[in-house]
């Protein structure tokens, strides 16, 4: 029996000014991140806390779901995943199935248990919020390394962890103007992502606060 890995996620929405770009070997950094060893199959129990700050007020809401992932080394698909919501009770059992093709293409379907209906997610819908989580459908699929252009944007520390900072701009259609990605230079794992809705506005930030070794694989446990 596979014991699910418990993951806690905190997303903070706010605005920030972005500046500065330097072009070095950003693509090599992303290759190290994407080529890091991953388990062939995994089950994660994820608790998501969404924090919004507006007009001096802080609002919080929570979501919980199970995520099943399966990696493929050959065939028509590179990865398949299923997200199934546990909390809140009003959306219990709601699911999102994602299939990633070997060519980087993706197909998604969501399931509404109360209506017993499954529906395919259209390309134009991938920028929409998924079940009011602050995730959009695009966040729950994999983008290929050629789908974005990367440049090195500096070096910073996240806590005690030295990181190389990348800035990515989409080549393939994306709901985001760009992303700022903080990569741990020791583990080659992502520590933080800032999602830009425009050149000067960050719409949300994902923090990966704890990464531990499980069975020889580096996995985030607190986000």
Each model region followed by its residue ranges:
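Hydrophobic h-region of N-terminal signal peptides that target proteins for export
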Residues: 11-20
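Short solvent-exposed loop/turn micro-motifs enriched in small/polar/acidic residues
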Residues: 91, 102-103, 148, 174-176, ...
